[in-house]
């Protein structure tokens, strides 16, 4: 289920005449050797799974997302002094979603324990349950006090659906229930919500759980100062941040390769300043990008956007330490 990094995906242009400053990602990414320390390194972990999308009656194909993101990352310019490792993929076989989520949670937990900053590449947004699980296990082992974790989701959907089985539509409800069992606070903000893609039941559940949100029509450039104030207020209330980006938060013309394209969406001119603010906070512990479906993409638009957002996080985040109390 967990496979080592495939080095053949890391290929691209080589500008040898430019020296070290002309390097690209494919020239600097290394395999995450299980025996080596990772203090300060960015660690990519793929989640090749769309079983949660299938359970949520969406359009499948996101299982191929991690490889597509890596291919777009490969030719991006590398920044000097930043170590990047590839921790391989967790692949979901058939409908074995829970096993795949457990496996990814374990991979992320291990990367955090080794001092890395993990970025998970989806895959459906069911990966959020695994991402939170990995961070929760890491933090729970370091303090008897409930950690103040903030989940910031850039998404057109709350993903708070009810249901006996987990799916791409349930992860944050599952996290809320897990926090309640642990006696931890549930701090969740969802920015980019579409009023026409969430039922009244989901808005009611969000209010019941104390979720903070902004609608997509409140997130254009004219509203950017207020959006960043909302982000700052959220960051001030927490010690550890998990940033998750569902690509369907973007306009359909920018991100067509998703299961549920947005009729409106939030422009990159707003999404990127949010990412920058969170990455620079010193509190970001883990990030992921979800819902890329290459079979629905046009000219790799969505994959390119996903890679740009991953690189934006990498460029903005400070090197992580080995422990987060």
From Swiss-Prot:
Gene3D superfamilies: Ureohydrolase domain. Belongs to the arginase family. The keyword Metal-binding applies. This is Formimidoylglutamase. GO terms for biological process: L-histidine catabolic process to glutamate and formamide; L-histidine catabolic process to glutamate and formate; putrescine biosynthetic process from arginine, via agmatine. Its EC number is 3.5.3.8. PROSITE patterns: ARGINASE_2. GO terms for molecular function: agmatinase activity; formimidoylglutamase activity; manganese ion binding. InterPro entries: HutG, Ureohydrolase, Ureohydrolase_dom_sf. Its cofactor is Mn(2+). The keyword Transcription regulation does not apply. NCBIfam families: hutG. It comes from Ralstonia nicotianae (strain ATCC BAA-1114 / GMI1000). Mn(2+) 1 binds at residues 125, 155, 159, 246. Mn(2+) 2 binds at residues 155, 157, 246, 248. Binds 2 manganese ions per subunit. Pathway: Amino-acid degradation; L-histidine degradation into L-glutamate; L-glutamate from N-formimidoyl-L-glutamate (hydrolase route): step 1/1. It is an enzyme of class 3 (hydrolase).
């Amino acid at each position: 289920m967990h496979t080592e990094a495939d080095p053949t995906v890391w290929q691209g242009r080589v500008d040898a005449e430019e020296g070290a400053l002309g390097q690209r990602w494919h020239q600097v990414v290394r395999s995450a050797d299980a025996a080596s320390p990772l203090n300060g390194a960015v660690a990519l972990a793929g989640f090749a799974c769309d079983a949660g999308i299938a359970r949520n009656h969406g359009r499948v194909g996101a299982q191929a997302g991690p490889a597509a993101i890596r291919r777009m990352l490969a030719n991006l310019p590398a920044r000097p002094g930043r170590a990047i490792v590839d921790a391989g993929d967790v692949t979901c076989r058939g409908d074995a979603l829970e096993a795949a989520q457990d496996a990814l949670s374990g991979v992320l937990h291990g990367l955090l324990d080794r001092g890395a900053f993990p970025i998970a590449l989806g895959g459906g947004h069911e990966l959020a349950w695994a991402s939170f699980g990995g961070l929760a296990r890491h933090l729970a082992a370091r303090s008897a006090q409930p950690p103040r974790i903030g989940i910031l989701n850039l998404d057109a959907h709350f993903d708070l659906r009810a249901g006996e089985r987990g799916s791409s539509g349930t992860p944050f409800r599952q996290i809320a229930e897990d926090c309640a069992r642990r006696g931890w606070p549930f701090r969740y903000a969802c920015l980019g919500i579409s009023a026409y893609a969430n039922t009244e039941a989901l808005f009611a559940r969000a209010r019941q759980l104390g979720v903070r949100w902004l609608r997509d029509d409140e997130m254009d450039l004219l509203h950017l100062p207020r959006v960043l104030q909302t982000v700052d207020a959220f960051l001030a209330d927490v010690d550890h941040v998990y940033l998750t980006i569902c690509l369907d938060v973007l306009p359909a013309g920018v991100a067509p390769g998703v299961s549920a394209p947005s009729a409106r969406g939030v422009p990159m001119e707003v999404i990127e300043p949010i990412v920058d603010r969170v990455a620079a906070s010193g509190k970001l512990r883990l990030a992921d990008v979800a819902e890329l479906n290459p079979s629905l993409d046009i000219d790799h638009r969505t994959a390119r956007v996903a890679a740009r957002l991953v690189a934006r996080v990498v460029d903005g985040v400070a090197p992580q330490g080995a422990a987060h109390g």
